[in-house]
Swiss-Prot record:
InterPro entries: Metallo-B-lactamas, PQQ_synth_PqqB, RibonucZ/Hydroxyglut_hydro
Function, in words: May be involved in the transport of PQQ or its precursor to the periplasm.
Source species: Methylobacterium radiotolerans (strain ATCC 27329 / DSM 1819 / JCM 2831 / NBRC 15690 / NCIMB 10815 / 0-1)
Protein name per the record: Coenzyme PQQ synthesis protein B
HAMAP family in the cross-refs: PQQ_syn_PqqB
Keyword annotations of the record: PQQ biosynthesis, Transport
Coiled coil: none
Family: Belongs to the PqqB family.
TM region(s), chain numbering: none
Pathway: Cofactor biosynthesis; pyrroloquinoline quinone biosynthesis
Lineage of producing organism: Bacteria, Pseudomonadati, Pseudomonadota, Alphaproteobacteria, Hyphomicrobiales
Length: 299
């Protein structure tokens, strides 16, 4: 199995377009210390030829350009992207669908709840019916988006997308609006969980024994944005478990048998983004890799 992290940042990317926090400032002025990053997306392949795109970020055109294995290879219209899977309906995971509209056939997969949110917005009708098939997938329903590559979706604690929040919103609920994906090919297993509000016993059992885990690395501490002075929301309020602190993911997953551990979906205020920082050193000493755009894994 081949995995390419196309985009490793959370919503807005790094640097965010209007942010002058210290980390965004370093990303502009000293990219050797803080690598710029695009928004959350990965691609997975069983054969290195046909690819499953998981989440379509607003930066998808640039991401595909930056990775030659994703370029058209034949005829006047072609893409090695054969299927797209959504793990939630967040803007940074669905806005890129508007770019993937140029008459290219593929199948769009997601839970019924996630696809319903897409179907309810007519702007996504630019993905022409009859060209892009929309296929709802049930929880724990194993399916093959590509030959030799199987995927099973499972609920993780989360919340509805920001643009669907109302007075009934529940943070930490396990529904089909936020899911993880267990991906298998050639006897190897990858768990991809870019959004997770807390680590539960059920989640630990689900991912035990995987060869690699790509996990929600949005915030280091629950109050990262407050500490940086750029926002008032906690990680919990946004539906993201912190790396460190009470119930932090590093400690919560420490005893779980996992091959490679990689943090993805990293917010611009997270100090682990700074190369060589004490926070980065601490996370790496705990056995985790901080993802960057273009990071590839062969499993």
């Amino acid at each position: 199995m081949r995995v390419v992290i196309l985009g490793s940042a959370a919503g807005g990317g790094l640097p965010q377009w209007n942010c002058r926090c210290p980390i965004c400032t370093l990303a502009r002025s000293e990219p050797d210390r803080v690598r710029p990053r695009t928004q959350s997306s990965i691609a997975v392949s069983a054969d290195g030829s046909d690819w499953l795109l998981i989440n379509a970020s607003p930066d998808i055109r640039q991401q595909l350009f930056d990775n030659p294995q994703m370029h058209p290879r034949e005829g006047l219209r072609h893409s090695p992207i054969r299927a797209v899977l959504l793990t939630n309906g967040d803007v940074d995971h669905v806005a890129g669908l508007l770019t993937l509209r140029e008459g290219q056939p593929y199948t769009l997969y997601g839970t019924r709840g996630i696809l319903d949110s897409v179907n309810a917005n007519r702007v996504f009708d630019v993905m022409a019916e009859g060209v892009v098939a929309r296929q709802p997938i049930g929880m724990d329903q194993r399916f093959e988006p590509l030959p030799g590559l199987s995927v099973t979706l499972f609920p993780v604690p989360g919340k509805v997308p920001l643009w669907l929040e109302d007075e009934t919103m529940e943070i930490g609920a396990e529904t089909e609006t936020t899911v993880g994906a267990l991906i298998e090919a050639g006897g190897r297993r990858l768990a991809y969980i870019p959004g997770c509000a807390r680590v539960t016993d059920g989640l630990r059992a689900r991912i035990a024994g995987v060869d690699a885990l790509l996990f929600d690395g949005t915030v280091l501490h629950d109050d990262d944005m407050i500490r940086a002075g750029v926002g008032t929301k906690t990680g919990w309020r946004m539906g993201h478990v912190p790396m460190r602190g009470a119930n932090g993911s590093i400690d919560a997953l420490a005893a779980v048998e996992i091959g490679r551990r990689v943090f993805v979906h990293i917010n611009n205020t997270n100090p682990v983004l700074v190369e060589g920082s004490p926070e980065r050193v601490d996370v790496e000493a705990a056995g985790w890799t901080v993802a960057h755009d273009g990071l590839s894994l062969s499993l």
